[in-house]
Amino acid sequence: MRLFILSLFALLVMFQYDFWFGKNGYLDYQDIKAEIIQRKQENKKLSQRNQTIFAEIQDLKNGIEAIEERARMEHEMIKQNEVFYRIVKNKNR
């Protein structure tokens, strides 16, 4: 009877070790859980970025004002018969 109880205890210890430290055990579960949280945050940021880009694309497709604004800001273009003034601050003051 004593040998039977000792065998059951050894079996329990073996299963517990496998549960905590084995492949796909509790520690692996915690690592994967943390990775899933991180990936969800990344996906949320990328989704927001995609929505912003999509809105900008729709604006460029549908509106002349967006194209004009982009040309003015990024390429410093001006309309015909328009004068462009650049004001530079004095570094000494």
Swiss-Prot record:
Subcellular location: Cell inner membrane
Transmembrane segments: 4-21
Keywords per UniProt: Cell cycle, Cell division, Cell inner membrane, Cell membrane, Coiled coil, Membrane, Transmembrane, Transmembrane helix
Cellular-component GO terms for this entry: cell division site; cell septum; plasma membrane
Annotated S-S bridges: none
GO BP terms: FtsZ-dependent cytokinesis
Periplasmic side: 22-93
Cytoplasmic side: 1-3
Family annotation (InterPro entries): Cell_div_FtsB, FtsL/DivIC
Membrane topology: Single-pass type II membrane protein
Subunit structure: Part of a complex composed of FtsB, FtsL and FtsQ.
Family per similarity comment: Belongs to the FtsB family.
Function text: Essential cell division protein. May link together the upstream cell division proteins, which are predominantly cytoplasmic, with the downstream cell division proteins, which are predominantly periplasmic.
PANTHER family listed in its UniProt record: CELL DIVISION PROTEIN FTSB
HAMAP family tied to this protein: FtsB (MF_00599)
Protein name according to UniProt: Cell division protein FtsB
Organism classification: Bacteria, Pseudomonadati, Pseudomonadota, Gammaproteobacteria, Pasteurellales
